[in-house]
């Protein structure tokens, strides 16, 4: 330290005095994956992870999704929350499956990729489930299938509609056939709901692929998709390499699927709550829904 620096007040810097680095809290700013805009984290969260600049629907966590659906300040009950995955096959690729489970649980704060809850939507009972893509890409293993089936059973017991928000890369390869059998298990659970005359609404979000798209995600009485969501069994690059042809622009996006009759409608995330409330009330032959706090 020079003699001049010793005489200078602490708040004044000379040209050669290094500036102190200011620490920015992690997650305070996020970058839109579509337009590249820098977005203030708390405001983005309040906007349901939709970019205010370009309206791009970014990934949203499962609990945030469900909290935005159910009536505020009302009790919700989580279904099969105690279930956690096990490495029954002692599977190992670059890492052991058990290590991947622990890492995903630590990173996401969840035991597995599907959260299911029972609550009310504008005063009417509802069971809903949502995928958390932050847990191993929302892959479907035994716990996901069991939670989905139990959620359908709760809807059957209560006599209410069931809604599922899908965001998944498909079946979890580390569980082998245990994962693939969940396709049949979840489809059978929906069959029991159908026999009881209870509606099931499937909401397909980005991305919905693999075994999830080939089972319960496309079995809704009404299939709704968020804008520009990737929906399909195999990805477009895999299909192009297989058929050796260039795919049409927008292939497998929700708008393409709507134009070709594969889904029923596209709904902005901000309007999903009202849309689901209207549809479930109509299908259950209930009065037009009103907000719980306005009733």
From Swiss-Prot:
Binds 1 zinc ion per subunit. InterPro entries: AcCoA_carboxyl_beta (IPR034733), Acetyl_CoA_COase_Trfase_b_su (IPR000438), ClpP/crotonase-like_dom_sf (IPR029045), COA_CT_N (IPR011762), Znf-ACC (IPR041010). GO terms for molecular function: acetyl-CoA carboxylase activity; ATP binding; carboxyl- or carbamoyltransferase activity; zinc ion binding. It is found in: Cytoplasm. Pathway: Lipid metabolism; malonyl-CoA biosynthesis; malonyl-CoA from acetyl-CoA: step 1/1. Keywords: ATP-binding, Cytoplasm, Fatty acid biosynthesis, Fatty acid metabolism, Lipid biosynthesis, Lipid metabolism, Metal-binding, Nucleotide-binding, Transferase, Zinc, Zinc-finger. It comes from the Bacteria. Residues 1-20 are annotated as: Disordered. GO terms for cellular component: acetate CoA-transferase complex. Its cofactor is Zn(2+). One of its GO terms (biological process) is malonyl-CoA biosynthetic process. A zinc finger (C4-type) spans 32-54. Its main location: cytoplasm. Disulfide bonds: none annotated. Its EC number is 2.1.3.15. Pfam families: Carboxyl_trans (PF01039), Zn_ribbon_ACC (PF17848). It catalyses: N(6)-carboxybiotinyl-L-lysyl-[protein] + acetyl-CoA = N(6)-biotinyl-L-lysyl-[protein] + malonyl-CoA. Zn(2+) binds at residues 32, 35, 51, 54. Belongs to the AccD/PCCB family. Component of the acetyl coenzyme A carboxylase (ACC) complex. Biotin carboxylase (BC) catalyzes the carboxylation of biotin on its carrier protein (BCCP) and then the CO(2) group is transferred by the transcarboxylase to acetyl-CoA to form malonyl-CoA. Acetyl-CoA carboxylase is a heterohexamer composed of biotin carboxyl carrier protein (AccB), biotin carboxylase (AccC) and two subunits each of ACCase subunit alpha (AccA) and ACCase subunit beta (AccD). This is Acetyl-coenzyme A carboxylase carboxyl transferase subunit beta.
